Every structure is written in C-alpha cells, then in structure tokens.
A protein has these predicted regions:
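Extracellular/lumenal carbohydrate-interaction signature centered on repeated Trp-anchored short motifs
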Residues: 10-13, 511-516, 571-577
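Short tryptophan-centered beta-strand motifs in secreted/extracellular beta-sheet-rich domains
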Residues: 378, 520-522, 577-594
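Secretory/extracellular carbohydrate-interaction modules
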Residues: 500-558
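Short, aromatic/His-centered strand-loop micro-motif at the edge of beta-sheets
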Residues: 560-580
Length: 635
C-alpha cells in the first residue's frame, strides 16, 4: 500500500477530522491544505507510537486536501457538528485498500452491497464484536460495541457507538472509548476497552428511566496482556460517565480480582438496578462478571444436590479452542468451573462507590469443561430470575461451538449471599455464531442484541466490507419455564416491505426475492415433514455451491447446511410441535423463529448476489404463507 497519498474532502458542517493511522516509517505526519494549496495544519505522529488517533480541527463548509506521509489512515470520519446525534459522523474512505468507494461515500454506497446485510447493523468497515452499554437515553437507544478501526480482525479494543430512535435505523457516532495508551506503542501487548454495560442515572447518580436521565453510567473491563502469554493477563472493571450521549469522562476502577484464586478471566460487567425479592437489597445495585473459580471452593454435597447457585444440567460436549475442534484435541482445566461473580454497591452509583463481592451467583458444573463464561447477564423477567452466559471453548454434542446458555429460576437468599436456584436451562439459539448477548430494560420490555461471529467461515477479507454484525433486536419472555425470544415489534413495523408473489413448479412453491433479503411467515396445520430452501450461495473460501435449509424430519426441526464447514453440525431446534415458522434472511445472515419465539436459530450464510429465492415443499397442510421484501435500514 502507498504510504504517501492525498484525498480531497468537503467538510460540510463538521468541525473535527478524526483519523486512525498506522505508522509506515519515520517522520509520519498528516498535512491539511485548503483549496488554494495553502497549508492549514500539519500534525506529526508522536515518535513512540505505531498507531495514533489524530483529532484535527477543520474549518466548516470548505474543500480541503488531507495528505498522509509515511503512514496509512485505516479509518476516518468527520465529527463535531450541530445535532451530531441526528446527523452522525461522515465517513471518509482514506484506506487505499477500500478503493471501490468514493472518498466520502453515502450510506447507500457503503451498505448497498450483496456482501453486506440490508437490515442488520454493521459498522462502516473493519472489525466489530460484542454489543455493549445498551440503554435508552433521552429518547434514543444507544448501542456501543467492541471495535477495531485498524483492521478486518480482532485487535486492541475500542468502543464504537451508534444511536437509534426505533431500534432499527441507526446513526453512527464517534468512537467512544480507546485502548490504553501503551497499546499504541508496544505491539507486544494487547487488550483495550473490553465489554461492559450501562445504567441511566439522574443528576445525583441515582438509577432512573432513560428518558428522565441526566447521564449514562458505563461499566467495562480494561484488559492488558503480553501477546501469547495468558499468565500475564490483567483484567479489572472501571466506570465512566456520559452526559451528552457522545463524550465520556475519565474512567475510575471499581472492581479488581478478589483474590489469587479468582480466575484471570474476570470481565464483561453487567449491572442491574431494578431487581427485587427476598435475596435483593433494594438499596443496592448488582453487577455480574464472567469468570472461572476453583472447584475446591464449592461444597461437594451442594454440587451433587444442585443447591442454589449450582447448575448441573449438561449437554455432553467437549473442550476445544476452535469451532472445528475435535474431542480430545485440547485439554480442559478440570480444577475450575465457569462462574458468574456477583458484586453489589449501595445507590447512588457514584464513580467511587464500593462494590462488595457477594460470591458466585451461578456456577455451571454441567458445563465444567468450558474455560469460562463470557458476557454474563442477570435480570428478572415475568416473575423469574434469568441468567445468561456464553460458554467459552465448549462444543456441545451436536457440534455447536461456544453457545450462549440461559438459566431460569429463582434468586435465593442464602447465608453466603444471593444464589440462583436453577429450574431449567437451555441454549439461547440453536444455530451457530450467535454470541455475546446483552439485554436491557425498556419500559417493561427486556430487549437483547447478539453479535454474529463467523464460526461458519463465511467472511473473507475484501475491500469495502465489515467483519461483524449485530442480530435483530429481540424481545425476551419466560414462557412455561423457558426463555423465548422474537424480534421486537419495531422490526416488523419498519422492515417488512412489499408482499411477494408465489409461483409453483414440479419442485414445490417458490418466491423470487429482490436483492436477496426477505421475511417469511408460515403457519402449519400438522406435524408432517417439510423442507424450506432458505438460500443458496457460493462458498467464499473454496467457490463450491452452498445451500441453507430448514427441515422437519420425523418430528425433528433443524437448520441444515450443504457445502459449508458446518455440514456435520446438528442444528436441532429441540422443538417437536412446530406450528409457525418465521424467517428473516438478509443477504448473508438468517434468523429463524419457531412458534412465536419458542426457539430461535441463526447463523451467517453468504447468499447469492442479485435476486434470491425462497422455496418450500410440505407433506402436510400449510394454512398460510406470507413472504415479503426485507427493507434496508440505511438512508
């Protein structure tokens, strides 16, 4: 790539140019000139840094030339304007690799590509993972997320940021949090601003409804380690405040590892403030973090009897470090168990409030093979307490890797502290790659986002795409002792477009889908077999043809892939009586919902460029089928 190049841009109403640059040699610098070639500013990259975030004031409503010398700008945008929460940042394509874009592409030019979804949230470009800090604040929903502006893969973590009025259409805001400064200097260390959550607070830091709030209090993990040396890991929890929905205060530490026996994995704080019941002190807020704890800390009788705080319902899987890992390839640590560590703090939630360790609210001995939880959650819903956690480095007996598990029960007041008495447990999604779920409360609803990681190997680096996608927002409920999930009502109101016409041939009923993005709703009258061809495509890694189906055979309903690395995985939904099937297929991702959310299954799948096709054959009676265009969200 060239390390000396220039681009011309229009500043419009923006006052700040933000560039995320990597050094290519000595004397790395950015120069700004006006339309007459006169130099406006020159900024050298600090000598010690290999990466740098330039913040350069620029005049409004002029044309300027931005010149890069001995560096490459990996990510860039204009920020700071009137009504930034409505206008958003203006993306600038300064990475020479993304040469198919205009210098200042529109949202339509960025997202209207078959390699990108139309209705699911993605950043402009680069890597994205976990949803963070979900909340509603002063009339807008805030979505923060793990982000690497420097490349297509995971690296030192920043927090990206977007807002929405309706949970569907999003506005991109400036990057919110950055890695620790030393990570820009020494490439031997990695880490950054890891995942966390949000609480909306009033002017006195008391938790309150988001539309009445004065600020967002955020909690997150700071991570630091020497690359390749897990024994060097340091993780601790911090807090910071956002008062205007855009900018952030200085962070303050709030929770360190409790003792030397505590797992090095100690991250992803999720704070809840509105819980109640015998085990809850209403004057305190509660935080769960992901970790693993020594088995020796747990009473053997308590484990064998599934006492409060213990889950023993397993799924007969194995420990592995990768999605294709075979049994016995990697060795688990049987001296530890995945656990959710519980902390509490007295309200109001000042930055220096003391968080008291309450012990493990839940430990999963049924999945002890897993290394640790990630992205834990604990909340109350429909009269029950629900815990959610992703099981790291675990593959279940059906072959699914790092699934997210839910636990439903009651929070008990024990002598050791609050403990979840688990009554039922299962997977949150029967597909693959739906990970890092985070929920938040919204006027009586419990809404959740997940992140799609690429376990099916659908993503190949190429210009002008992103690597990372959020799920549709789902609303959770507890029904008959099980956690259910279904897209929020706004998804149906905003995304469903024109109805498509049905056609028939000797192979069944089919619908031609413009731009390969559609919603399908089918009501079934009986338990007979069916086959639904959701999408076809070309495998991006080897060029072979692929298919994605939903099948029912002998009472078992499952997703089936052909031509992918997941062909040997059994995506069994676990549901026997299926009467309603909903499918959201969005160019390269599918989300399936059975029986109004009784089960959900999803995965990445790269569909055909151009128009797609939905096709089905049913042995029994189909009461009705409705197929609609899935409208795009970027405008």
């Amino acid at each position: 790539m060239p390390d000396n190049y220039s681009v011309a841009i229009e500043t419009g109403g923006y006052r700040l140019l933000e560039l995320f640059a990597e050094r290519c040699g000595d004397d790395a610098a950015i120069t700004i000139t006006d339309g007459d070639g006169h130099q406006i500013a020159s900024h050298a990259m600090p000598v010690a840094e290999r990466r740098h975030h330039f913040l350069i004031p620029v005049p409004t409503n002029v044309r300027i030339t931005v010149s890069a010398h001995r560096l490459t700008v990996r990510f860039a945008y204009l920020s700071e304007c009137e009504n930034l929460l409505d206008e958003g940042v203006r993306f600038i394509s300064m990475n020479p690799y993304d040469n198919e874009w205009d210098t200042q592409p529109t949202l339509e030019q960025i997202y209207d590509r078959f390699a990108r979804p139309a209705a699911h949230f993605e950043p402009f470009a680069r890597w994205m993972n976990d949803p963070n800090g979900l909340c509603r604040f002063q009339g807008r929903y805030h979505l923060f997320y793990q982000f690497n502006p420097y490349g297509f893969g995971w690296d030192n973590m920043h927090w990206g940021h977007a807002v929405s009025r309706d949970l569907v259409h999003w506005t991109h805001l400036p990057i919110f949090l950055e890695p620790q400064p030393e990570l820009h200097i020494d490439e031997r260390i990695v880490g950054g601003a890891f995942s966390g959550s949000a609480v909306t607070v009033d002017a006195c830091d008391n938790p309150c409804k988001g539309d009445d709030a004065a600020a967002i209090r955020l909690y997150l993990t700071r991570h630091l380690e020497t690359r390749g040396d897990e024994s060097s890991v340091t993780e601790y929890q911090t807090t910071c405040l956002c008062e205007d929905g855009v900018h952030v205060s200085v962070e303050s530490p709030v929770a360190l590892r409790v003792n030397d026996g505590f797992g090095f994995d100690f991250r992803d704080p999720k704070v809840e403030t509105g819980m109640s019941g015998e085990a809850i002190n209403p004057e305190r807020a509660y935080m769960v973090t992901a970790t693993n704890l020594p088995v020796s800390e747990f009473d053997t009788d308590a484990v064998s009897s599934a006492a409060p705080g213990i889950s023993v319902q397993g799924t007969d899987g194995w420990f592995t470090c990768g999605p294709q890992g075979r049994p016995g390839t990697d060795k688990p640590n049987m001296d530890t168990v995945p656990a959710m560590a519980l902390f509490s703090a007295k309200k109001p939630l000042k930055r220096n409030v003391t968080w008291q360790y309450e012990g493990p609210v839940l430990a999963d001995f049924g999945h002890q093979l897993s290394r640790t939880y990630e992205c834990p959650d604990l909340f109350q819903l429909d009269g029950k307490t629900v815990a959610i956690g992703a099981l790291m480095h675990y593959r279940d007996k059906q072959g699914r890797f790092q699934q997210v598990r839910w636990y439903v029960g009651d929070l008990k007041d024990t002598a050791e502290g609050p403990r979840l008495q688990v009554e039922n447990s299962d997977w949150c999604d029967f597909g693959t790659g739906y990970y890092a779920m985070q929920s938040f409360a919204d006027d009586g609803r419990r809404i959740v986002f997940g992140w799609y990681t690429d376990f099916p190997a659908m993503r190949v680096e190429k210009p002008c795409i992103a690597n990372g996608m959020m799920s549709l927002p789902r609303e959770l409920h507890v029904r008959d002792g099980r956690l259910t999930s279904r897209p929020v009502k706004e998804a149906y109101e905003q995304l469903l477009g024109d109805r498509l016409e049905a056609h028939a041939d000797e192979n069944g009923t089919f619908f031609i889908v413009p731009n390969n993005a559609y919603y399908m709703d089918m009501h079934l009258a009986d338990d007979n077999d069916f086959t639904m061809l959701i999408a076809t495509g070309t495998n991006p890694t080897n060029g072979n043809s692929m298919e994605l189906q939903l099948q029912r055979r002998n009472g078992v309903t499952r997703l089936v892939t052909k031509g992918t690395v997941a062909d040997n995985v059994d995506f069994d939904s676990g549901i026997t009586d299926v009467r309603r099937v909903e499918i959201f297929f969005d160019r390269n991702v599918v989300e399936v919902f059975l029986n109004n959310g009784e089960a959900a299954g999803s995965m990445l799948f790269q569909g055909t460029d151009g128009d797609g096709e939905f096709r089905f054959v049913a042995d029994g009676k189909v009461d009705c089928v409705d197929v609609r265009v899935l409208d795009g969200i970027w405008r």
